[in-house]
Amino acid sequence: SHRRPRARAGANRVSSCDVSRYGDPVSSTPRCPSCRRFVYLDTLVCPECGTEMGMQVIDRVFVALRDGRTTGEDGTWFACSEREWGCNWLVRDDAPAGRCISCRLTRTRPEQDDTIALEKLAKVEEAKRRLLLQIGDLGLPIVPWYTTPGGLGFDLLSSRSDGRKVIIGHANGIITIDLAESLDDVREAVRVKLGEPYRTILGHLRHEIGHYYQNVLIQDDETWARCRDLFGDERASYQEALTRHYAVGAPQSWQDSFISEYATMHPWEDFAETFAHYLHIVGTLQTAAAIGIRLDAGASTLRDTDV
């Protein structure tokens, strides 16, 4: 499937809200609050000492939980009500339905009795939390769909639930993801069909949120003109560009001017692909820093790689 173009947003400038004001960047090594063992961002229980934990995203730290809560100098935090589906973020007692900001950004999800789809949802929600942490690192505004028209939201749907095709894409702030792509065999089949070098859920999210931020960050004519100088005129027909891309492919020597073959299709996709690959690179460097990998700047044996 191909990605839908996003609709051009209005000229209303949006401002950041509390959900994007995070503390230390995620590159700081996450550790168990009890035994200080390195843990992963999706950890619910420390594999070393058994401490139940949750992430307090404002200060970007894991804290120990007792009976699903923790109390400190900044008050009491509670486990997100979606913890049974893998969410380890914490909330205040006034959080709507006890759900964290990441879970509340999901506008549409499978029905509660669709347990198979909900298992897929848990994997996609994990990737979404990683995305939001990274967006917070960059200081980008996160304005929810339920507070502002055109705000950020996610429709997480499964094409396996009712047989209807789900088109991955972005429109007016809402990012749509097909939960079926959380299955490795489904995602790999699509990757091979489209001739892509790799295909991941987190990659989809990073790409589609690039469409969202193109509208959020570029508001005035001068900035749009600079954007068009770099990426091309986004007012060109998307449908014609889509048809041409899948008929003839990327131009020769595309590597000289574009980050990926898909970026050659249309200026919208060039921006979104560039945004996504920037997040790929930053995420790789953050992971390297967290686990202690060091690069030798003087090494001469490094070769060009496909990022």
Go through the PLM ranges and name each one.
Residues 17-143, 147, 300, 307:
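N-terminal low-structure segments adjacent to metalloprotease catalytic domains
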Residues 125-184:
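Auxiliary, metal-adjacent structural segments of Zn-dependent hydrolase domains
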Residues 136, 140, 214-222, 276-284:
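Hydrophobic/aromatic-lined pockets within catalytic cores
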Residues 199-219, 272:
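Active-site recognition of the HExxH zinc-binding catalytic motif
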Residues 185-205:
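Short pre-active-site segment immediately N-terminal to the catalytic Zn-binding motif
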Residues 195, 215-246:
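Post-HEXXH active-site segment of zinc metalloproteases
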Residues 1-25:
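N-terminal amphipathic/basic-hydrophobic helices that include classical n-h-c signal peptides
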Residues 37, 263-307:
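Pan-zinc metallopeptidase signature
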